Amino acid sequence: AYGTPLFVRRIRPNGDVELARGGDEFFSGIVLTDAARADGRPILAGERYGVKVRSRAAAASCTVEAAENGSVTLRFDEPQRAPAPGQAAVLYDGELVRGGGTICEML
């Protein structure tokens, strides 16, 4: 009906869904909620990880830009295609899972 692929860009607090058209699906970063490390240590600004937003995707290199109260902002080294709100983001150090969170916003 729209003539082009659409994807969820943002889910607003009131439940409204913001869509975006194909071609606008590359993002330079994501914000996670309920973010935590598997070992219980805090996620700190400046740390580097690989992050996967799809289980079969290669991990994308990123830097923690900000981390506070379970909210973590990650900035990708290279823009990434179509992360979406509600998806899990898993943080890696090489092959080791270090933590993760739920995507709430794309940057």
Locate predicted features:
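AMP-forming adenylation/ATP pyrophosphatase catalytic core
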Residues: 1-107
